[in-house]
């Protein structure tokens, strides 16, 4: 009975030894070795003659104990020197007593030769690892050749032997890489490279099988214990981690994209274990990087298809996979398969993001500082790739939602704050973006790009001019520390002053701000004399204060640097029109539209120039082109999934939807049946306009600029129809615009003009008043209202309204002309003459459209 009990104890210790070697519990090895030796001593009852698993004599047990202790000592030494191993720094035996002791044990075992072939082979594998870490790469390769690792089988072997073999293959590959190349021939080098990749691929597969089997065994043993007792997470050793990733890293480094991607996809398809979760995040991030940076959409192949033949021919498989036991893969019906590289990269990154953000170390205690830094770097790298991926598809809302999830661990992390801020800018959440940028300024106060970005947003979409001025002053206050961004700081401040001048209601304030704007912009030009953007805005500022000749000189300099700039060409056309060279202006606009066919501002200027030069008929034809451009750029399928005909030829028809609908009569001559040129233009415009019938539910979809542009097209067409006295057609156009924005001041103003042309003066006056209520600074509205009040006999009130208009915009010659007419009607001839002279002087330098239509933005 005693012998039977001792035999059971021996089996239990032996099983525990195998488990500890597989799971890496090296601190338990000395105690287990002592128990084993005690049981194996004569009289201990553990000598099991005839047992295939442990038929040791006492000297054999002593050598077996040395093997176990040598492995434990070496693994503990490697754990203590993980950083050096990672940096490929050889460990010196004299500085590492554990490694020295392990080497002595292993040398003794191999010299005695008393152990069974299995354990002698294990000793060689462990000694090969030791040779590698001490920098003896040839000795490591020789030891693995002596052990015969290429012919080893994994069938019916203990788990720890899988780990040893996986590490052996990766170490052999790393050792081959580090051998000197001076003597070897090119053929031998190529052969060696192939052998390295073969070693890495074998190591990867064996490591994955080992980790899957280890988790299965651990879970089974845990299930036999109490519920709620969870197995400890297995910590990957350096060499196991290298085994998992060396194959795809080596292939990608050599330019073998097909094999590298195949390795990565295989790794990601294997059934994961707890130990490989972090590794899979890294692999997914790596594959996403390859898909984004190294593979075009034309060369992409899905995980379930084969790569292009030209790729297949170059990269043959380097080893026979049939001989290896494959890890378990995720399989099943109806698995999702990406259609292109962006889709696959996005899928990988979204999965990686969910795992990485879950594992981020939030604790700020000093002991976890390094872990926190590493986890944050991994998460930030994933978000950077997500920014690239979603940015390519314009999915900025989705990107901002992803980045917002990072805010829970972004405390003090400038890069993440800045990424979130930029994503908010891109998806149109400008106010939120400015709030985030304020925090970024606090985190990095010496970085001029952050306040510049904030100023750009404030100037552009928000028009928060006081905040823009504050941010611009931040950049300027940095002085020389701002470097190349200092001129941009002055540019931002100059544009802010210019916009403030446009918004100012008092002429004295306008003049002061225009002066400050010009001085600041000229300072920016002194700092960056060849910057075309700075020169452009100096020219624009000169144009705004009607220094037309000086503005033209500056603009010529800007065009020398950037000949095809849309804003510069647009300003040139407006300057020509201010000099009354309308044909030159039209030629410039046509040239600019050739370069920038989707620029609506240029198209509207062309309509105005044609209206002045050729009359409303030609302008209506261009209006039709603008409407078609709108339809092309903002198709119904993008907005609401409506049907849309792809053809834009004559006779275009499409299925009409309920909602807005425009029908323009053909304006036939009833007697002769002939059609005037204006009627032809009108019918063509009707043809284009009738295509744009849409449900009102669509109107709130898409950016606001989309619909304000369409409103402007309708109102421009209405103005041209009114000039031709086609009042019914004009009414339909205004009705369409009103369907978009019923209370828009532009719509109310145009309805007032239509009522005025029809002779409904009281209605016109009321509509002008409503428009002025919506837009109290509308000079054009004030002008029309003033003249209407004068016609109705309210001379004093008309004079007040027109004086407000010229005070609000002192360069509006129409307002001066109207004020002169009212003063003349009141008998104030001298004051009227002054107004007429001012109007005449201003009209001589007035463009067809205000210079302020040129966007002032960074």
From Swiss-Prot:
SMART domains: TPR (SM00028). GO terms for biological process: hemopoiesis; intracellular iron ion homeostasis; phosphatidylinositol phosphate biosynthetic process; protein localization to plasma membrane. GO terms for cellular component: cytoplasm; plasma membrane. Keywords: Cell membrane, Cytoplasm, Disease variant, Membrane, Phosphoprotein, Repeat, TPR repeat. The modification Phosphoserine is found at residues 51, 182, 647, 678-679, 690. It holds the Pfam family TPR_8. Signal peptide: none annotated. The keyword Phosphoprotein applies. TPR repeats lie at residues 121-157, 177-210, 414-447, 497-531, 533-565, 566-599, 745-778, 780-812, 813-846. Expressed in epithelial cells of the intestine, thymus, and pancreas (at protein level). PROSITE patterns: TPR (PS50005), TPR_REGION (PS50293). InterPro entries: Endocytosis_PI4K-reg_protein, TPR-like_helical_dom_sf, TPR_rpt, TTC7_N. The modification Phosphothreonine is found at residue 693. It is found in: Cytoplasm; Cell membrane. It comes from the Eukaryota. Component of a complex required to localize phosphatidylinositol 4-kinase (PI4K) to the plasma membrane. The complex acts as a regulator of phosphatidylinositol 4-phosphate (PtdIns(4)P) synthesis. In the complex, plays a central role in bridging PI4KA to EFR3B and HYCC1, via direct interactions. Component of a phosphatidylinositol 4-kinase (PI4K) complex, composed of PI4KA, EFR3 (EFR3A or EFR3B), TTC7 (TTC7A or TTC7B) and HYCC (HYCC1 or HYCC2). Interacts with PI4KA. Interaction with PI4KA is direct. Interacts with EFR3 (EFR3A or EFR3B), interaction is direct. Interacts with HYCC (HYCC1 or HYCC2), interaction is direct. Association with the PI4K complex is strongly reduced by TMEM150A. It is linked to Gastrointestinal defects and immunodeficiency syndrome 1: An autosomal recessive congenital disorder in which obstructions occur at various levels throughout the small and large intestines, ultimately leading to organ failure. Surgical interventions are palliative but do not provide long-term survival. Some patients exhibit inflammatory bowel disease (IBD), with or without intestinal atresia, and in some cases, the intestinal features are associated with either mild or severe combined immunodeficiency. This is Tetratricopeptide repeat protein 7A. It comes from Homo sapiens.
